[in-house]
């Protein structure tokens, strides 16, 4: 592998490290601050958080392994995704369902489902990106792009919470900022 390619893979790992930090800062006031009691949270919240954190850690690790020439280890960690990704999809579905059920108690079913529209879209988009990444696992360029896509989806929830929690940004404005940033990185 050329030095230029190696640097690119390492840069991708560092970008996902930044995503990890941003996401954890975003969830600090809504989740991590409640440590160790986590009184308002159910086991599902913890499982979902663990799976999402694991996925981002895999996104950090995988390009670094390629960048350092550890291809066999990259394949082993990638094999773990066959367990992690389906569990992550199930946790996304269950978290979305739980949020919908809470929303129905506070508003109409129509409003509750509208509030979950982004989560539903992300569930299907993540599933599609992951499926395509695995279908193209022998084509490094395509595989990498689809896997990166799974990570870009995490900008929205993390940055929305970060902007709302730390800067008191209106939800709609935070959504626009997160979306523009995601699209900008993707392009």
Walk through the language-model features, giving the residues of each:
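Alpha-helical membrane insertion/targeting regions
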Residues: 1-187
């Amino acid at each position: 592998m050329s030095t230029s390619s190696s640097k690119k893979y390492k840069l991708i790992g560092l970008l996902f490290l930044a995503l990890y930090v941003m996401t954890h800062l975003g969830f600090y006031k809504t989740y991590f601050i409640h440590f160790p009691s986590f009184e308002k949270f159910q086991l599902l919240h913890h499982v979902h958080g663990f799976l999402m954190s694991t996925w981002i850690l895999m996104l950090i690790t995988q390009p670094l392994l390629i960048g350092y020439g550890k291809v066999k280890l990259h394949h082993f960690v990638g094999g773990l995704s066959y367990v992690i990704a389906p569990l992550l999809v199930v946790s996304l579905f269950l978290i979305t369902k739980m949020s919908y059920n809470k929303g129905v108690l506070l508003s109409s079913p129509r409003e509750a489902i509208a509030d979950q529209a982004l989560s539903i879209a992300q569930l299907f988009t993540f599933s599609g990106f992951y499926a395509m990444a695995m279908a193209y696992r022998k084509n490094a360029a395509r595989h990498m792009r689809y896997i990166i896509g799974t990570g870009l989806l995490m900008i929205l929830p993390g940055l929305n919470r970060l902007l709302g929690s730390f800067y008191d940004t209106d939800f709609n404005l935070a959504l626009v900022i997160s979306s523009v940033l995601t699209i900008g990185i993707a392009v």
